[in-house]
C-alpha cells in the first residue's frame, strides 16, 4: 500500500493519503484539496481555483488531473467555469486516513 504522509492544515495533524491508484499530479491535487485557505475538503467543497493554486500545477494540467479524478470516482466539480467548486466523493474522502 502506497501511503503519502502530510500534515492537514485544518486539523494540524499528521494524516495519510492512500495513493495506490493515483498519479503524482493526482496526489498533488488531493493534498491541495486538504491544504487550502478556504475549506477542508472533508467538510464539503472548496473553490477549484484554490486547489489549483495550492497544487502547484498549471490550470491546464490541473483541469486534466481533475477530469481523471472524476473518472476514477474520487471527485466532482459543480458550478460554471471560473466559479466552480471542487469536492470529493465518499470514495475520494476514504483515501485519507489518520493512521
Locate predicted features.
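Long, low-complexity, charged/polar intrinsically disordered regions in eukaryotic proteins
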Residues: 1-20
